[in-house]
């Protein structure tokens, strides 16, 4: 059994990058596994729902959804906590985290798909995850 946590995610997922950033900040041993065509079967066996990020703990526990993942790990790794110790500050921190998760991503998704050049770029990047080489065959 590996001592590393496994993070199934993708660079295009802000929630995956959020979780990976947390692991890096806390210096928690982990492996970054890109969810793609090669890892999909393994992901399907683990996933409760078909979303990333998914974290597999060394104890084989599956965690999904960025905020609950981080909350769970804060209990196991309390050093250098990201949660302020003062209750009012902790509330404000949690408020901004929730706001960012639910609303700050809206403009990101808008600009990912609004303009033709961005649509083309994002489409190619998403397509390469599950059908490698597909963009080379299309006149995009």
Segments predicted by a language model, with ranges:
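GST-like domain detector, emphasizing the conserved glutathione-binding G-site
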Residues: 1-137
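Alpha-helix-centered segments that form part of catalytic cores
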Residues: 140
């Amino acid at each position: 059994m590996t001592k590393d946590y496994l993070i199934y995610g993708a660079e295009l997922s802000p929630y995956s990058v959020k979780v990976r950033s947390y692991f890096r900040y806390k210096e928690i041993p982990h492996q970054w596994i890109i969810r793609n065509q090669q890892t999909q079967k393994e992901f399907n066996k683990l996933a409760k729902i078909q979303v990333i990020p998914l974290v597999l703990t060394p104890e084989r526990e599956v965690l999904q959804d960025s905020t609950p993942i981080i909350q769970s790990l804060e209990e196991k790794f309390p050093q250098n906590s990201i949660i302020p110790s003062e209750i009012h500050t902790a509330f404000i921190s949690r408020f901004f985290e929730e706001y960012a998760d639910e609303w700050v991503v809206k403009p990101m998704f808008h600009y990912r798909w609004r303009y033709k050049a961005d649509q083309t770029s994002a489409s190619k990047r998403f397509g390469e995850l599950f059908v490698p080489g597909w963009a080379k065959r299309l006149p995009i």
